């Protein structure tokens, strides 16, 4: 029993024109990554909100964090950190998530601090009429 907690927080009234299955798969991969790299009792937060120019989704955990030498490589296919060899996976979850998010016109950023956790921020712009 890992006893990890997910906290969901956001507006009930946001909508995003997207391929629901693929975008769900992308976010699932990010959340699974958080589960894989947190200890028992960890908290994983998933928040979403409207911004003036779009929609933002944040997946944040209080896990071990991503080592600075790895942070610029985590979206490369088949990349596995030497610090994550004890977890399952082949290094395709985050690259797939990034590809799906970008195919939807979005962008993903990662911020991490060793021993404090990691935050993935996804932004989707809302098209405006000119």
Residue ranges of predicted features:
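Acidic ATP/Mg2+-coordinating residue in the GHKL
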Residues: 61
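Short conserved segments within the C-terminal catalytic ATPase subdomain
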Residues: 1-8
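Short alpha-helical Gxxx[C/S/T] motif in the catalytic ATP-binding
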Residues: 93, 97
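Short conserved segment of the HATPase_c
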Residues: 66-78, 98
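Conserved glycine-rich
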Residues: 105-106
């Amino acid at each position: 029993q890992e006893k990890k907690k997910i906290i969901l927080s956001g507006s009930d009234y946001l909508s995003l024109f997207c391929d629901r299955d693929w975008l769900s798969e992308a976010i699932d991969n990010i959340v699974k990554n958080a589960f894989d790299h947190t200890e028992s009792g960890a908290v994983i937060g998933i928040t979403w909100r409207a911004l003036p120019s779009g929609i933002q989704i944040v997946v944040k955990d209080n896990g071990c964090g991503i080592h600075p030498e790895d942070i610029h490589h985590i979206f490369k296919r088949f990349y596995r950190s030497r610090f994550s060899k004890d977890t399952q996976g082949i290094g395709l979850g985050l690259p797939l998530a990034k590809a799906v998010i970008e195919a939807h016109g979005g962008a993903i950023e990662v911020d991490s601090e060793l021993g404090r956790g990691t935050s993935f921020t996804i932004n989707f712009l809302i098209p405006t009429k000119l």
